[in-house]
């Protein structure tokens, strides 16, 4: 359930309440509560989400008994995959009625998640801990000032994150050995000012200035220095000393853009950005955009853009424990794209929309996070990357009959991402190969069929094979993650009573019981279900009518 992730509540009139209870396979429970109040001046929203599950689904382990030629592989349970996630989001907005709007947002997250045991881990005992915990508070104060031809927005905020990663194993002596005890604290203070100014109907000027102060402390309490450097306590006993990083960095960003529409059909825009990370400045980063209305019939529009890219490694990229890489280089390159879009239809009958985009990027020192054999991920630079391809999107809404509606949305992507870096050695086979974990082909379709208070949904997605080694080796089982198709369905029925609106929804995930992995050696659940009950009392509406 991701509804708490939204950053702005829907406008409310009076008091409203919504409660959703979900129950699913593997003893999975989801709960969602929303309280809202609104009038002409005030809008408030309180949202709470709690999700938990042992996540101990069964799977067939093809990575054990590899010499077996039939299908008699072990059936095992997903170990160390339990999770508990709590989210609370509070928002308050006040409108003065004279063009000023003040806002307060506070979002708290408390999460505890196990990292499942790899299917190639052959230890039989369950004395194992691989767990990540997180507590995060995000708070933002905002002010928006709106006038007929211009507007100004100001934001200031604070983000605090505490993260812990623990890895423990029983090594055969009956005792749990603490191998990793990573602790990270991140504090960020930020401010942002943005503005827009309209000059007539043809010109729009925008500007944004932002500043972030990051403070990161990341240590591993379990790392001990070498013997000749290891300190001792007053009794002469060697002590453990945490090893890690305590870093701070200020980041500044400035962006200005000019948009010009000389005719009804043609639009032009240019943007300039410059950023500072610590004591390093990026060069001026330009971007150019244009769009042209080819035909009003069907609203056929051609679009194109060219932009320069520049990205410094974040402090997490550099120093997070475990996995941070302090040797990362900054990423930079150019991106080009062009495409067509259209939208047509008949009122009350159908609407059809679609777009196709070609893109081409040349990136040096691409920063990518990759999984390691130790169970965590780490970032690396890929010296030269050529990423290009085509993305196609389409949507259709049809009124089939008086009470019948059909809608569908789909997309298809062809995204080669080729490593063109210099070989480390003359025999390096990674040059000219697809980057790891990036599928060359992917697609998805979502369809809805509605009849009065009934709603049926079908979701389908496809991912082509993803390579796990830089040379795209397919001779071994660990060289790739196999392609897979996925289908999910749901059926929802809405009920309207005098005292409340209710809906009951049943979901079947992985309808065809597909065996698949998203990450090498991490099996995913097969066919599973969820049931949701949604309740929305009408007391506010009933009182208003009375």
Predicted regions and their residues:
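Short strand-turn segments of transmembrane beta-barrel domains in outer membranes
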Residues: 6-37, 46-48, 76-81
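Periplasmic-side early beta-strands and strand-to-turn transitions of outer-membrane beta-barrels
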Residues: 37-130
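Membrane-embedded beta-barrel scaffold of Gram-negative outer-membrane proteins
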Residues: 42, 46-49, 55, 149-167, ...
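C-terminal beta-signal and adjacent terminal beta-strands/loops
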Residues: 53-59, 364, 406, 462-471, ...
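Flexible loop and strand-edge segments within Gram-negative outer membrane beta-barrel domains
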Residues: 79-85, 99-152, 160-185
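Surface-exposed extracellular loop regions of Gram-negative outer-membrane beta-barrel proteins
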Residues: 112, 162-164, 278-284, 290-292, ...
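Structural signature of Gram-negative outer-membrane beta-barrels, strongest in the C-terminal barrel
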Residues: 202-204, 210-214, 229-231, 236-361
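Gram-negative outer-membrane beta-barrel transporters
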Residues: 263-265, 358-362, 381-470, 501
């Amino acid at each position: 359930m991701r509804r708490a992730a939204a950053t702005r509540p829907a406008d409310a009139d009076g008091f409203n309440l919504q409660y959703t209870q979900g129950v699913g396979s593997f003893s999975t429970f989801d709960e969602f509560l929303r309280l809202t109040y609104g009038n002409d001046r005030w809008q408030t929203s309180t949202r709470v989400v709690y999700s938990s599950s042992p996540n101990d689904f069964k799977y067939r382990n093809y990575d054990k008994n590899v010499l077996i030629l039939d299908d008699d592989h072990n059936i095992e349970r997903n170990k160390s995959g339990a999770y508990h996630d709590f989210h609370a989001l509070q928002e308050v907005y006040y409108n003065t009625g004279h063009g000023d709007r003040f806002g307060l947002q506070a979002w708290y997250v408390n999460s505890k998640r196990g990292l499942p045991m790899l299917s190639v881990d052959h230890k039989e005992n369950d004395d194992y801990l691989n767990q990540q915990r997180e507590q995060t508070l995000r708070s933002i104060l905002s002010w928006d000032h709106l006038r007929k031809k211009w507007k100004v927005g100001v934001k200031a905020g604070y983000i605090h994150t505490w993260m812990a990663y623990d890895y423990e194993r029983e090594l055969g002596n009956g005792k749990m050995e603490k191998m990793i005890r990573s602790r990270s604290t991140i504090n960020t203070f930020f401010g942002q000012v943005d503005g827009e100014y309209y000059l007539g109907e043809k010109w729009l000027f925008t500007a944004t200035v932002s500043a972030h102060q990051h403070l990161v402390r990341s240590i591993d309490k379990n790392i001990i220095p070498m013997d000749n450097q290891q300190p001792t306590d007053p009794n002469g006993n060697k002590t453990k000393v945490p090893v890690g990083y305590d870093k701070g960095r200020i980041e500044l960003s400035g962006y200005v853009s000019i948009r010009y529409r000389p005719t009804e059909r043609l639009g032009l825009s240019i943007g300039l950005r410059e950023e500072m990370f610590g004591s390093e400045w990026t060069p001026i980063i330009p971007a150019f955009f244009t769009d042209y209305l080819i035909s009003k019939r069907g609203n056929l529009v051609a679009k194109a853009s060219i932009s320069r890219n520049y990205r410094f490694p974040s402090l997490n990229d550099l120093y997070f424990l475990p996995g941070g890489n302090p040797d990362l280089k900054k990423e930079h390159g150019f991106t080009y794209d062009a495409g067509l879009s259209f939208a047509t239809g008949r009122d009350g009958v159908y609407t059809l929309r679609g777009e196709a985009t070609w893109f081409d990027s040349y990136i040096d020192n691409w920063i990518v996070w990759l999984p390691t054999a130790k169970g965590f991920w780490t970032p690396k630079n890929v010296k030269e990357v050529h990423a290009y391809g085509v993305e196609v999107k389409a949507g259709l809404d049809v009124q089939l009959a008086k009470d019948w509606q059909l809608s569908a949305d789909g997309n298809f992507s062809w995204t080669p991402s080729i490593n063109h870096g210099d070989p480390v050695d003359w025999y390096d086979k990674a040059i000219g190969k697809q980057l790891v974990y990036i599928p060359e082909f992917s697609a998805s379709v979502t369809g809805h069929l509605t009849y009065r208070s009934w709603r049926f949904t079908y979701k389908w997605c496809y991912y082509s094979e993803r390579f796990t080694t830089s040379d795209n080796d397919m001779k071994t089982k660990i060289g790739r993650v196999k392609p897979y198709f996925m289908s999910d369905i749901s059926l929802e029925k809405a009920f309207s009573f005098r005292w409340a609106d209710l809906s009951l929804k049943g979901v079947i995930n992985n309808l065809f019981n597909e065996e698949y992995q998203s990450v090498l050696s991490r099996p995913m659940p097969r066919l599973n279900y969820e049931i949701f009950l949604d309740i929305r009392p009408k007391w506010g509406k009933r009182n208003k009518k009375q």
